[in-house]
């Protein structure tokens, strides 16, 4: 029987429920338990696929093609699981399912209400996502007290009652601020947050108290007294300089022991040697490189969360400290490429819309002409093709039909037909809805032997995740390859170009897929490791010249 750990948050948002949940799951996995994680989002959008990155941050794409919350990226990086559409659902999805059932007549003419129909659908979705796990950690998005979260909180309250204390446990993450002017830690916000939670019928079993320093014993006792939580279950969740230290910290606070004792589970001791190795590799690098990330969402780096982490993972696996310099592609359009001069490598990530595209193309040109290692992902591959078409193949005005529908040379165009994971034909047009209509999820790509991509992966076939509507236009295949563009990866049926390279360049690669979604701190990713090794070689070459 699956046991459940429900994680809620209080006082303020962005306290790190996702990382806390993933870290606890990592410890439980290290104790030999089969775990899974779910994220419940209170917003009415069906999924975050059409939400602005400035509002929501990154959209994480799962293997089965779901567009989900970025916390699922944390789950996959901390725990050796592949999440899917059952691991993340929203208020919009829940209401959509209930309304669909009502239209079918499933409720036999009854009045459809939040309780029991919405809460029952939430409980059904939680149980479906948790199926087969020893322990399911269920994170409730938002903050206790938000009106949007109430149906979710009511649903997990009911589950706690239905399953009993030995099968369900509640963890509440809260803020314990330090007031510098008074020189004191304040526990009142935590007390009020727990009071709010208890007012809707949930008594937390464990408190994770987010603070910039460990809780003094006096404050711990005070919190325990006023929240009705046993003192040893009031855990200090201190700020750390490296999120991959958090499993080690929470284990040192005996969080996993408290959880397993309350759930009546016997498990072997945790083997956290992998996490110790990760932390050690980050703290003692052999070299340092600077990678310029040229994008349009650089004011909110959470927009590139998986990409940031993938570069860190590559640093772990190559003994390199990777410093990311975020560069606004719009500024490159007006200020020129001077800001690129002292970089060891350039990366152009994915994105949508015309804003900043010419700046990205300028960054590609600089990398190509100056022999700087370049990695282009999704749109980053497309702008590499556009730049090559314009300045090497001589196709003046070459562009993507996403930005210039009437371009004389549409080297990038809308995909109108492709095969999905099950081999079914998917068709789209320019008039299709924006939500959920892209080429999404894991797709098999065949690599050409003797190419850089094949060298990095060491395999003829790979599976990577996609999220795009536009693709390389095969009508320009002969022209561009004749000019020197290398096509090193194609879709399984050979119809779509997935990877491009330049043969007379130290390291230049563009991929239509998103390799960052499958990178983890313990395993890394071959493409990013190859990119960072190339950045190190570039750094050493630059240092030699300056000496």
UniProtKB/Swiss-Prot annotation:
The gene is pyrG. It catalyses: UTP + L-glutamine + ATP + H2O = CTP + L-glutamate + ADP + phosphate + 2 H(+); L-glutamine + H2O = L-glutamate + NH4(+); UTP + NH4(+) + ATP = CTP + ADP + phosphate + 2 H(+). The active site is at residues 378, 514, 516. ATP binds at residues 14-19, 71. L-glutamine binds at residues 351, 379-382, 402, 469. InterPro entries: Class_I_gatase-like, CTP_synthase, CTP_synthase_N, GATASE, GATase1_CTP_Synthase, P-loop_NTPase. This is CTP synthase. Pathway: Pyrimidine metabolism; CTP biosynthesis via de novo pathway; CTP from UDP: step 2/2. Catalyzes the ATP-dependent amination of UTP to CTP with either L-glutamine or ammonia as the source of nitrogen. Regulates intracellular CTP levels through interactions with the four ribonucleotide triphosphates. CTPSs have evolved a hybrid strategy for distinguishing between UTP and CTP. The overlapping regions of the product feedback inhibitory and substrate sites recognize a common feature in both compounds, the triphosphate moiety. To differentiate isosteric substrate and product pyrimidine rings, an additional pocket far from the expected kinase/ligase catalytic site, specifically recognizes the cytosine and ribose portions of the product inhibitor. CTP binds at residues 13, 146-148, 186-191, 222. It comes from the Bacteria.
